[in-house]
């Protein structure tokens, strides 16, 4: 039996709700934030500290979930420079059309990410991304672990940044010399990763491999979950097969430390009331979604994020419009949902 959550008060639930309209951006989150071509991007840390290098980065929810959630908002032709992570990184195109490139110079592999698709780039693969659409776009990020570590940048990214007043320290602290900041006596600038170390660590993905790490909402694999109901469909995108949930493997079937599922509800459809043993985060992609938690109700609009209290009874419903959400759950093999009554 899943332990029941302390009955949440409305203020508790509001603290777990991140409205798209209330997102607090950081425009100097990373070493390349002033490099021409990358100087108009905004970084968001929704849940967890993420990998931002700026001490000014606002964190919306600090409660550990076992994974981190973030976001990036970029205008057309704005680039996030080549880098790699120590844990799994997946990102979902909520709006805009994106190109994701691999390789230290971005010339090894390429995949396009239209709105409503998701890509997961394995650890130690140099990756960068660019908004190639005509409007401002938003990427929603999922990073494995409570502490996803630090970003490793392609060597030329560090060199270019020096010309624009930003220096990354070995400690991970970002110094803005244009703002009058300076190094402490015991600090040293981060040197580019040695070539022999890159040769040993870096993983390479070409165009063919890149096609295998992208999944669209249409490719998500529907299954008869414990919370299925007429007009309510859950479908696997990230994660291995999970007999406890009767879930098939998603197209992206390797371990991430979390699973990602699409959840769609037709107008006036509703899920059964149920509990979950793991952290569960709901990101609304389209429509309007009502989430009832222990008798309280919250309405999500597109771009809103909500962290459901672990163990709390929850129910999802749509009213006049179809709702499509991206769901992130902790663990590679979440427990079966427990129906309430």
Question: Positions of the model-derived regions?
Answer:
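A short, N-terminal "cap"/entry segment at the start of jelly-roll beta-barrel domains
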Residues: 1-65, 169-257
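Double-stranded beta-helix
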Residues: 2-11, 126-209, 313-341
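Short beta-strand His + acidic residue motifs that chelate non-heme Fe in jelly-roll/DSBH
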Residues: 80-82, 100-102, 109, 121, ...
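Glycine- and acidic-residue-biased ligand/ion/polar-headgroup-sensing regions
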Residues: 75-78, 86-99, 103-104, 277-294
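Conserved short histidine dyad/triad with adjacent acidic residue
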Residues: 49-57, 68-85, 243-248, 259-276, ...
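Short acidic-glycine-tyrosine-enriched beta hairpin
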Residues: 88, 104-122, 295-311
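Ligand-binding pocket scaffold of soluble enzyme catalytic domains
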Residues: 68-70, 99-102, 108-111, 249, ...
């Amino acid at each position: 039996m899943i332990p029941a959550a302390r009955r949440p008060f409305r203020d508790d639930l509001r603290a777990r709700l991140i409205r798209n309209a209330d997102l607090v951006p950081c425009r100097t989150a990373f070493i390349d934030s002033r490099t021409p071509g990358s100087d108009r991007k905004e970084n968001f840390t929704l849940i967890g500290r993420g990998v931002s290098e700026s001490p000014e980065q606002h964190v919306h929810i600090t409660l550990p979930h076992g994974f981190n959630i973030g976001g990036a908002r970029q205008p057309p032709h704005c680039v996030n420079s080549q880098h790699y992570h120590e844990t799994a990184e997946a990102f979902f195109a909520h709006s805009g059309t994106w190109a994701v490139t691999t390789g230290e110079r971005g010339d090894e592999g390429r995949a396009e990410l239209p709105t409503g698709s998701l890509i997961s780039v394995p650890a130690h693969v140099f990756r960068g991304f660019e908004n190639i659409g005509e409007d401002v776009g938003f990427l929603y990020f999922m990073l494995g672990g409570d502490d996803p570590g630090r970003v490793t940048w392609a060597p030329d990214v560090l060199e270019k940044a020096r010309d624009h007043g930003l220096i990354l320290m070995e400690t991970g602290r970002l110094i803005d010399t244009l703002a009058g900041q300076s190094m402490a006596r015991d600090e040293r600038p981060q040197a580019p990763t040695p070539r022999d170390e890159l040769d040993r660590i870096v993983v390479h993905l070409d165009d063919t491999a890149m096609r295998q790490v992208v999944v669209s909402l249409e490719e998500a694999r529907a299954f008869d979950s414990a919370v299925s109901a007429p007009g309510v469909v859950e479908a696997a995108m990230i994660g291995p097969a999970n007999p406890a949930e009767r879930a098939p493997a998603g197209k992206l079937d390797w371990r991430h430390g979390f699973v990602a599922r699409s959840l769609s509800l037709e107008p006036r459809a509703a899920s059964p009331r149920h509990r979950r043993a793991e952290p569960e985060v709901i990101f609304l992609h389209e429509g309007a979604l009502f989430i009832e938690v222990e008798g309280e109700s919250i309405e999500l609009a597109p771009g809103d994020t909500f962290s459901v209290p672990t163990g709390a009874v929850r129910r999802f419903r749509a009213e006049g419009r179809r709702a499509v959400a991206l769901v992130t759950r902790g663990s590679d093999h979440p427990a079966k949902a427990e129906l309430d009554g």
